[in-house]
Amino acid sequence: MFANLLNAVKDGVKRKDRFTLDELRRLNDVVARTTAVTTANRDALVETFREIAELMIWGDQNEPTFFDAFVEMRTLTHFSRFINQQARHRAGHRQGQPARGGSHLTLQLLQTLSIMLQNIQLETSLFYLFSNNHVNELIECDFDFDDEEVMAYYISLLKTISLKLNPATVQFFFDYGDGVRGGNKK
């Protein structure tokens, strides 16, 4: 799965017309307009998040304004929103309510974030991904660890994060016990 995504990014020179800020905005709009995951839109959302990862990796290596747009559009907030939504649906399912959307979207979001973290080269981009507690919230999310695939993708994400830790990035994971994170304690 990872190889297919990376090959698609490397082949981006052939399909460069697809790698535009307008396309990134279009994909973000799809995610922003989607309020809930259903069986009818799940596959489209999975593909949308996969394409966002492709664009972000290509942008990091070829056009830094992609990351600026990613930040301005608050795309990472949508990652958190859908992961938390899936966790709530799973909790509802445990209480006898029907599950919606399944783990496909959760897997794609975990994979997308892992791939982005693995391939982001600009330190400022990495700082943004680790700041604002988005990654912390994803780490703390109530994933379905009974699903071996979810557990494997989660572990992969944790390994990827650990490989990016250094004295400058580890500060984003400190918790001072008073709700302050990220080295912002005064």
Regions found by a protein language model. Name each.
Residues 1-186:
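Elongated alpha-helical scaffolds that mediate protein-protein interactions in large eukaryotic proteins
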